[in-house]
Every structure is written in C-alpha cells, then in structure tokens.
C-alpha cells in the first residue's frame, strides 16, 4: 500500500520535537508526529505515556514549551481550542457531551443555525444540512430526533457530524470504542473508513491492539513521554507493538495458573429480578476464575450488583460458604467475605477528589477508628502496604486519586477491596480502559488470588481475556444464562453463539 508521503503528499498536521512539562513532570519530550490526509494513524502507549498531553497539544488546550505545531507545513500557535477548531482540528472523546433535550440537528449547529431574512432560525435548512452530513457519513439518523436516548455509538456519530460541520480535516478519536458493542464498533469503523476515503486525517487512540491493527495504517508509539517510533503497521505483530510500548518483552498477557478448585464459595440459585434477569443459577469454587460473558445489556452487571446486595432481587437466593445472604444488604455481603470491583471505577469505585490513601482505606474504617476518630497513622500504613503490593504509581499517597492514570486508579479500587480479605471477588470489566502493561499485572493478580484460594467471578466483554483467564465461562443472553463452557471447550465461536442466543444452556 502506498503511503501518502510516498506520493509527495504533505502532512496536514504535525508536531516537531515538542516538549511539555507540568512542574517537575515532563509529560512530552521531543515528540514528533505526522498526520496525512486519507490515513488513519494510531497513537499507542501505556497510561502515563503522554497520549493525553499530545492530544491536548494538537487540540489547542496546551501550548508546547519547546518545538512546533505545524499546519500544512507551516508553524502555527493555537491560543485555545477555538483556534484549533477553526484550523479544522476536532477531538471526538469516548464520552460525548450532547445536550439531551435538543435534537441531533440542534446539537450539531448549536449557535450556528441558518437564519431567515428576519433573523429567525431556518429549521428546514438546519434539518437539511444535518441530513446531508449523515448521508456523507453513510448513516441513518433522524436530524429531528432528541439526543436523549441515543446510544453512545450514535452520540459519537453526532459528534463526528458536528466536527464535519466545522469543515474538520483532522479528527482525533480518543478511545472511541471503549463503551461500544462489537456491532457498534463495526459501524463506527465504517464511518472512519468513509472519512479516510474522503481525505480526512484520523488520529486513533485505543488500548485495544486488535482495533489498531484493524483500522490503522501507521502507528506512533510513546513511552514515558518520549517518542519511540512512527512506522507502518504492515508486517508488525501485536507483540512487536507491546515491546515498543513497555520497553521490554511483556510476560504472558494471560498468566493463568492451573489450580484444582476447592470447596464451593459462592452459590447463586434461581436469582430473578423482574424485567432484568431471570432464573440465574451458578456457583464459583475456591481457586476458580469463572468468567461471566455476554453482550452489553445481557444482564451481567445487574446480576453482580444483586449478588453483592446493591440491588434487591425478587426471587432466588445467594450463599457464601453455604450461608445465605440478606437480600439488598451490601454490608452483610462484605461481612460474609464478598467484594465487588464495579464496572465504572470513577463513578462507583472511587471518590475522585479524595486522596489515594483515603480511597484505599474506605473499606477498613471499622478497623482504623478509635474512640470515634479515624486513626490516620493506621489508615496510612494500611493504604501504603496495599499500594506497594499492587505497585500503584503515584507521587504522594496523599494526592487525590484523580491525579492517577486509569490503570493506577483501577489498582486503587482493587487495593481497597483486597484489603478486606475477600473469600469471593467479583470484578466487573477489570481491565477496561487500561494499558496493556497494567492489564498483564491485573491478570497476574487475579491468577495469584485464585491460586491463594479466592473465588473470582470476572465479568468481561474482552473475549481474549475471557478465554485466557477463565476456568469456566458462563454466558448470558437477554437476562438468562444460556451456556456454561469449560476452559477446554471455550472458543470465540462457542461463546459468541451463546451470547447471541444461538446455543442452548
């Protein structure tokens, strides 16, 4: 395949030897990047590698301390995001920010609606302009439909259409697939290819390496704020890219230790919550990692929340070590030895404006409170111990957890719950949105916990993770368990057949 530079095409947007520091922290060090028209270019690196700073530099949020941003080959200074937008640069974030009560057309042309002669908004022209954008993207979305109720995938398409309405030539897509189903990812990739074929330059950021290899032609890799390489993906393997990202050969990504399951630790029998899930039964034994697989909306997270007592169930029973749990009582579940690492770590697993040590210490307040006051020394000692065990990277343990990368935030959530000494650990999407190096660390941790006798129930939408880490795979479809598959029989085909309702339990 001919690269644009081989035909004399110049990069539409580039960085040359850009550096950026925040206090004593050097976020970018002599980083260079070239984005060409008609190409999808990946930006790869672990959390903390400098990807976010690079994106914000291209988008006009940050100004480089050294080096240059080049637009059509000429140095340019963006004084803010508005300058970058006017230059044709748009960022599509993983969580769109639309006004829910406005229509798709109103969201796209907010403050810029076509006007009639007397200054009144020309709704037909706004509708027609939006319809033309959707036609250009090859999607069918009603311009008059309210944004409320749109899927994340459709919201992202609206954001892309909005970017095109500003005549964007460069689209920066930051983890756009993190919350999408497989079919939604395929649809989004169709839109990306359309943009590419129409001459747009696309910078694509994803922790899912298979997506990078599927949609991108070239990749720039960052490590610890430094530029490592910019190169074609053709001829590379995922292992090659991982080595560039982490600077070493990564140990096995799925280091599952073989164990002999012990006694039954968790038993769920005929659990039902009307309209959500029905007649769900399974068990997890000590030393096992049992995966709960299925499509988004199948009811997996809802089952986990009910088991832990966050939500009440209407029928059925849950037992830990043969003793029944009280319906809808998380404190009782904790006391029985259950721990739940939730899917949304920022909203449900952490208090973002609280320190790292306080977040880790939240589950141990009963053991660190003396005479009605928290023993800060005991709390800090306990938190430091777990932060070291899980290799959390931070400047000071008193810093807010919001200052950490996504992978280190996930380690804090894990530390908080492991500090309770759980018999049963439920982890919901444990590696979503974290880099490949941290993902391997989380997998090693789960494997070691199972080897130590903890019963692990792992909810995951990452099929390679399910196949690589689970002793057994339970599959849900539309609120029901449709299959239980052994490790030896589990394949992408058997799991997906059950997840889509094509296999019977």
UniProtKB/Swiss-Prot annotation:
Disulfide cross-links: none
Residues given in the record as ATP binding sites: 45-52
GO MF entry, a single one: ATP hydrolysis activity
InterPro entries: AAA+_ATPase, ABC_carbohydrate_import_ATPase, ABC_transporter-like_ATP-bd, ABC_transporter-like_CS, P-loop_NTPase
GO cellular component entries: plasma membrane
Family: Belongs to the ABC transporter superfamily. Ribose importer (TC 3.A.1.2.1) family.
Function: Part of the ABC transporter complex RbsABC involved in ribose import. Responsible for energy coupling to the transport system.
Oligomer and partners: The complex is composed of an ATP-binding protein (RbsA), two transmembrane proteins (RbsC) and a solute-binding protein (RbsB).
Protein name, entry field: Ribose import ATP-binding protein RbsA 1
Lineage, broadest ranks: Bacteria, Bacillati, Actinomycetota, Actinomycetes, Kitasatosporales
Chain's gene name: rbsA1
